[in-house]
């Protein structure tokens, strides 16, 4: 089963009172909520590095996917979501789910860059 949703907007949440020092509390310290238009498609929760992450999950009835990443992936994930033209949230199995991009051509050098 392959489920894929195009993502065109996000909302971010960061908690001020949660420790980012590690440990296995299982409590997320940041979250990114993913949308296709006005439809909520799921979230990515970020946990302190070293936390044992839960596997991804899917709720087919609601059309939502839940992902769990290490906090060290937070900046690159936000960068990908803000800067890639085409981003999709996908779920294939409990061991294969995440974000992916579409084809993005390399920039053509301008005369100034030569």
List the model feature ranges, each with a label.
Residues 1-9, 19-22, 62-66, 73-76, ...:
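Short linear motifs at secondary-structure transitions and domain/linker junctions
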Residues 1-45:
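OB-fold ssDNA-binding interfaces and closely related basic DNA-contact patches used
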Residues 7, 49, 56-57, 106, ...:
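Generic low-complexity segments that are intrinsically disordered, proline-rich and/or Lys/Arg-biased
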Residues 13-15, 33-35, 45-47, 70, ...:
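A structural detector for beta-sheet-dominated domains
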Residues 17, 39, 51, 96, ...:
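Generic "edge-of-domain/loop-turn" microfeature
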Residues 25-31, 53-57, 96-104:
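Short, well-ordered strand-loop elements centered on a beta-strand within folded domains, enriched
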Residues 39-78:
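Acidic, aromatic-enriched beta-alpha/helix-loop junctions
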Residues 66-114:
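Short, compact, well-ordered microdomains
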């Amino acid at each position: 089963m392959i489920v894929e949703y195009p993502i065109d907007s996000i909302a971010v949440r960061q908690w001020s009172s949660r420790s980012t020092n590690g440990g296995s509390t299982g409590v997320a310290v940041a979250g990114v909520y993913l949308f296709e238009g006005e439809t909520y498609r799921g979230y990515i929760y970020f946990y302190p590095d070293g936390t044992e992450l839960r596997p991804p999950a899917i709720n087919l009835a609601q059309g939502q996917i839940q992902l769990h990443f290490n906090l060290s992936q937070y900046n690159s994930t936000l960068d990908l979501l803000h800067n890639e033209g085409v981003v999709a949230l996908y779920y294939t199995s409990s061991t294969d789910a995440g974000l992916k991009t579409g084809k993005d051509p390399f920039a053509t050098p301008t005369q100034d860059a030569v």
